[in-house]
Amino acid sequence: MNLQEILKEIDFKKGSDLIPTIIQDFYSGEVLMLAYMNKESLEKTIETNTTWFWSRSREELWNKGATSGHFQYVKSIHIDCDGDTLLIKVEQLGPACHTGHRSCFYTPLI
């Protein structure tokens, strides 16, 4: 599939031009984080083979690892059955969470 065909498969309109994106460790299967992508960040992710996201608080694109060095190298990208959520499997360098934890999901509730 080329980039335009990939973008046609994704329903960006449901989430105000943003889609939730689950980041999972390619090797262990551990869920590392959830972030949001728009078309531009998905295009940059595919072009660079590293994850790019849309920051809802800063309203700007950001490349995971650009500041910390904890890059995420894309191994595969999957779309869900409704076309409105992505699962990206990555090779994670260092911790995924800005707190220094491997995963953003380190706090158990139950």
Curated annotation (Swiss-Prot):
Under NCBIfam families, the record lists: PRK00051.1
Binding site residues for Mg(2+): D80, D82, D84
Where found? Answer: Cytoplasm
Question: Mind telling me what this protein is named?
Answer: Phosphoribosyl-AMP cyclohydrolase
Task: Please give the cofactor(s) recorded in the UniProt entry for this protein.
Answer: Mg(2+); Zn(2+)
Q: Which PANTHER family match?
A: HISTIDINE BIOSYNTHESIS BIFUNCTIONAL PROTEIN, HISTIDINE BIOSYNTHESIS BIFUNCTIONAL PROTEIN HIS7
* Cleaved signal peptide residues: none
Q: Which GO terms describe its cellular component?
A: cytoplasm
SUBUNIT field:
Homodimer.
Top EC class per UniProt? hydrolase
What role is this protein assigned? Catalyzes the hydrolysis of the adenine ring of phosphoribosyl-AMP.
What Pfam families does the annotation carry? PRA-CH
- What's an example Gene Ontology biological process for this entry? L-histidine biosynthetic process
Matching HAMAP family: HisI
- Pathway it works in: Amino-acid biosynthesis; L-histidine biosynthesis; L-histidine from 5-phospho-alpha-D-ribose 1-diphosphate: step 3/9
Alphabetically ordered keywords of this record: Amino-acid biosynthesis, Cytoplasm, Histidine biosynthesis, Hydrolase, Magnesium, Metal-binding, Zinc
Q: Which family does it belong to?
A: Belongs to the PRA-CH family.
Residues involved in Zn(2+) binding? C81, C97, C104
